[in-house]
Design a protein with these regions (language model features):
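Glycine/proline-rich active-site loop of Rossmann-fold NAD(P)-dependent oxidoreductases
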Residues: 34, 60, 85-102, 112-116, ...
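C-terminal "lid/loop" region of Rossmann-like NAD(P)-dependent oxidoreductases
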Residues: 123, 151-153, 161-168, 175-192
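Conserved Rossmann-fold NAD(P)-dependent oxidoreductase catalytic core, especially the SDR/UDP-sugar
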Residues: 10-52, 78
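Conserved C-terminal active-site "lid" loop/helix of NAD(P)H-dependent oxidoreductases
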Residues: 133, 152, 186-212
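Amphipathic terminal alpha-helices
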Residues: 197-199, 210-229
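Single conserved hydrophobic/aromatic residue that forms the stacking wall/gate
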Residues: 1-13
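Active-site Tyr-X1-5-Lys
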Residues: 32, 50-83, 102-113
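Non-catalytic, hydrophobic alpha-helical segments
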Residues: 136, 140, 155, 166, ...
């Protein structure tokens, strides 16, 4: 469905004479064993992660389609690859959510249930970068007005933290007082995108810190809970 939607939309925009379009990809399009931190040049250089290969191929097809339309028809379709996003209306499914909402749910449930300790996979050393969803929206508008070209742009803050630091921050914000344990025998692989320097040169205003983003998320969550009472 992702492949069909991407190609159909791009084709309609082209036929209607749309000269500017922004295609949002995903960091999962990069090879499974790409050198860290990942660069845009790593795209299509080796095997993809098998667990999300279909989705990755659909996204790759979308950004390459934009590139080919630019080349053949002179359109100005840009491709933006966001880093890990967070914020209101995220997915907190117990088995199908990303790392940040998954951690928030785990520690929230541990707090409610009075769980003495929470065990996390790995050793907590991998690095991750997060971007508040409103910052991505602002950056997308800014890129539409200030960037042209077929080269894919990685969008993010350029600031990273370890999974251990992230876990401790989540526990603090949620109010979990128990022990955090780590199981290094369990696998945990995290990828890190390299943010193009020119993004920082043209970005409009500072990005939100994780602390401030969490505060906004907590305010949204409390308002949502009140509305459901």
């Amino acid at each position: 469905s992702t492949l069909l939607a991407s190609s159909a939309a791009s084709d309609v925009y082209k036929r209607q004479g749309c000269k500017k379009l922004e295609f949002l990809g995903s960091s999962c399009i990069y090879p499974r064993m790409a050198p860290q931190p990942m660069k845009e040049s790593c795209l299509l250089t080796s095997e993809l992660e098998k667990t999300n290969e279909a989705y990755a191929l659909a996204k790759i097809s979308g950004l390459k389609y934009c590139e080919f339309l630019n080349r053949q028809y002179g359109t100005d379709y840009i491709s933006v690859m966001p880093t890990n996003l967070y914020g209101p209306n995220d997915n907190y499914h117990p088995t199908h959510s990303h790392v940040l909402p998954a951690l928030i749910r785990r520690f929230h449930e541990a707090k409610i249930n009075g769980t003495e300790s929470v065990t996390c996979w790995g050793d907590g050393s991998p690095l991750r970068e997060f971007l508040y969803v409103d910052d991505l929206a602002n950056l997308c508008v800014f890129l539409m007005n200030n960037y042209s070209g077929s080269e894919t742009v990685n969008a993010g803050t350029g600031k990273e933290l370890t999974i251990k630091e992230l876990t401790e921050l989540v526990a603090k914000v949620v109010g979990y007082k128990g022990e955090i344990k780590w199981d290094p025998t369990k696998p945990m692989q995290f990828t890190q995108e390299e943010i193009r320097e020119h993004i920082h040169e043209i970005e409009k205003g500072p990005f939100m810190t994780l602390d401030e983003g969490f505060k906004r998320f907590e305010a949204w969550k409390q308002d949502l809970l009140k509305s459901r009472l």
